[in-house]
Amino acid sequence: LPDLSIDHLKMGLIRSGHCPLTPESDDADLTAYLWPIVREIIKTAIENHQRLVVEGCYIPFDYRSSFESRYLGQIQFVCLCFSQAYLAEHFDVIQRYANVIEQRLDDSGCTKEQLQRENEENLRLCQQYSCPYILLEYPYHIDLDSL
């Protein structure tokens, strides 16, 4: 399936000078800037009968309010959240594999406490807005070589 990384879109807009924000800007500001663009990309894919995976943290939890029902029937949303217990016990594993998908230049700001706060807030917002989520509570194994 084709995919769109909202983070790649963000960095392209920032590096090209077409975005007044920076990578360090507040997530709420980045979401407010990026979501209208991403929303219209999603609509275009649906109208063209194309499948598209859109991934990233800049999708608002009230995303449904951005679409008419004819679009909503074509959208599958899922949020991945770690439980507090999982993060407390397996933070070292998360750090060890942080660069598997993309090479991160500086992850020093990523702390166990920060991830716990973010995941707790994401879970709360999923529940508030009735968004589907997967709560990762137990160790799991994904064989990356088989993908």
List PLM regions with ranges:
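NTP-dependent small-molecule kinase module
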Residues: E120-L147
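Short, hinge-like loop/turn segments at secondary-structure boundaries
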Residues: C19-P23, R70-G73, Q95-Y97
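A glycine- and Lys/Arg-enriched "phosphate-lid" helix/loop adjacent to the NTP-binding pocket
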Residues: I75-E120
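Conserved nucleotide-binding/hydrolysis micro-motifs of P-loop NTPases
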Residues: H8-M11, I59-P60, C81-A88, Y140-H141
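Short, electropositive alpha-helical surface patch
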Residues: C57-V78
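Short glycine-/polar-rich loops that comprise or flank the Walker A/P-loop
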Residues: L1, Y71-Q76, Y129-C131
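Conserved nucleotide-sensing/catalytic segment adjacent to the nucleotide-binding pocket
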Residues: P2-C57
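Aromatic/hydrophobic pocket-lining residues that form π-stacking "cages" and hydrophobic walls in ligand
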Residues: I41, R64, N122
